[in-house]
């Protein structure tokens, strides 16, 4: 009964059973390639695969899932090596609490629960990404607009590109990216299909998963206000969208006694603060001007590439709610200080900027499409594995 209901729901959004399976198949195939490469690197560096998939922020996520916010052991520290009673509140609760709930199943460890959550969320994200690709490829500027057959292919290509971004390895780690991208993707599907309750609820969820949820909230609220003539459901989306984000900030306020408690924790522990892009500009100029570290140069080039993709998306007239979301993601990351080497990971939710690339690849013969995605999958697997085993600092 549940499967029938799910299929019925997907058909409401123009998603056939066959298309959904293809999206999931493309996604899982590319992610399996990445995991195989990571396994090889783990062996070369005498490290366990489990340790790699749960390192850095993953340790925090699993720690919160196991101990809750109040019971985190003292060895869990912020970016400066400091532990306080409030440090854990830097991490939004959506992902670790979901893992904690799944781990209630007898026999499941928090790590196993996290992997299950990520696989399910990744598959849901893949279907949403595919649908976004189909919709947007048929709504961009007329000179590059896809035919119905090309639109379906463009959606699948977009899924492949999403699964093969340089740091897509985090989709399989105990990180928030898989869950966040699923919620962000379905929120955008809701906006594009004018399904306002779906959009509002997914935005609410995204706001509970990570601070980048403000990008989803902004896109949903603005689109719903513009479409206010759709009636009560549009207004419901406006009300629902920010509740998760604001609710968690209120929880941290209650714990710390400060309305800006969460921001203070971030600034003190990870130097994350709005600076108008000064730190990003400094990183780009210093790295590309005189830097020699491969990982830093690759990250700098990735930042520039994302900005170029944004300009390309604007030129292609990708639907404006999608551009609002992408712009908000970029602004929230590039206009703030913090750990520069985490930018490649944090920019993963800007997958919608790959739409112009997907549309053009979709016009090529099938063999060329498969070859392109195969190369992308291999590069993604290598880059992600290298960042986890060779690069020595947090991502």
Q: Which residues does each PLM region occupy?
A:
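Loop-to-helix entry region of an early transmembrane alpha helix in multi-pass inner-membrane enzymes
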Residues: 89, 93, 97, 105-127, ...
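Short hydrophobic/aromatic helix or loop-helix immediately within or flanking a transmembrane segment
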Residues: 56-107, 276-280
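Transmembrane-helix motifs of polytopic, lipid-linked glycan transferases
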Residues: 101, 113-140, 305-312
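Transmembrane-helix signature of polytopic, membrane-embedded enzymes
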Residues: 109-112, 130-164, 182, 324
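Membrane-lumen/periplasm interface segments of specific transmembrane helices
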Residues: 30-48, 53, 217-326
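Multi-pass, polyprenyl lipid-linked donor-dependent membrane glycosyltransferases
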Residues: 117-120, 157-186, 205-216, 343-349
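Membrane-interface alpha helices of multi-pass inner-membrane proteins
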Residues: 163, 170, 184-189, 197-225, ...
């Amino acid at each position: 009964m549940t499967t029938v209901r799910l299929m019925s729901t997907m058909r409401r959004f123009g998603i056939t059973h066959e298309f959904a399976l293809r999206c999931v198949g493309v996604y899982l195939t590319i992610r399996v390639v990445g995991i195989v490469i990571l396994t090889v690197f783990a062996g070369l560096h005498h490290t366990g695969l489990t340790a790699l998939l749960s390192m850095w922020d993953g340790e925090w996520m699993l720690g919160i899932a196991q101990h809750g916010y109040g019971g985190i052991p003292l060895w869990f520290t912020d970016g400066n090596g400091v532990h306080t009673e409030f440090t854990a509140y830097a991490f939004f609760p959506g992902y670790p609490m979901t893992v904690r709930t799944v781990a209630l199943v007898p026999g499941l460890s928090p790590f196993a629960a996290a992997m299950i959550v990520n696989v399910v969320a990744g598959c849901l994200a893949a279907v949403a990404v595919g649908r976004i690709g189909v919709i947007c490829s048929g709504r961009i500027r007329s000179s590059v607009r896809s035919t119905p057959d090309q639109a379906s292919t463009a959606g699948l290509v977009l899924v492949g590109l999403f699964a093969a971004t340089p740091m897509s390895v985090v989709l399989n780690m105990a990180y928030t990216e898989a869950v966040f991208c699923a919620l962000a993707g379905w929120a955008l599907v809701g906006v594009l299909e004018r399904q306002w309750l779906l959009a509002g609820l997914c935005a609410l969820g995204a706001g509970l998963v990570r601070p980048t949820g403000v990008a989803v909230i902004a896109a949903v609220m603005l689109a719903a206000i513009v479409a206010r003539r759709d009636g009560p459901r549009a207004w419901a989306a406006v009300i629902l969208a920010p509740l998760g984000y604001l609710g968690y900030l209120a929880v941290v306020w209650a714990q710390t006694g400060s309305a800006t408690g969460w921001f203070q924790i971030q600034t003190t522990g990870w130097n994350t603060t709005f600076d108008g892009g000064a730190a990003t500009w400094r990183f780009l100029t210093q790295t590309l001007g005189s830097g020699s570290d491969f990982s830093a140069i690759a990250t700098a080039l990735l930042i520039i590439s994302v900005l170029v993709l944004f300009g390309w998306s604007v030129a292609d007239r990708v639907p404006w709610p999608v551009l609002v979301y992408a712009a908000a993601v970029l602004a929230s990351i590039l206009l703030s200080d913090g750990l520069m080497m985490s930018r490649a990971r944090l920019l993963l939710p800007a997958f919608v900027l790959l739409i112009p690339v997907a549309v053009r690849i979709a016009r090529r013969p099938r063999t060329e499409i498969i070859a392109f995605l195969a190369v992308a999958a291999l590069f993604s697997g290598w880059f992600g594995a290298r960042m986890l085993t060779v690069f020595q600092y947090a991502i």
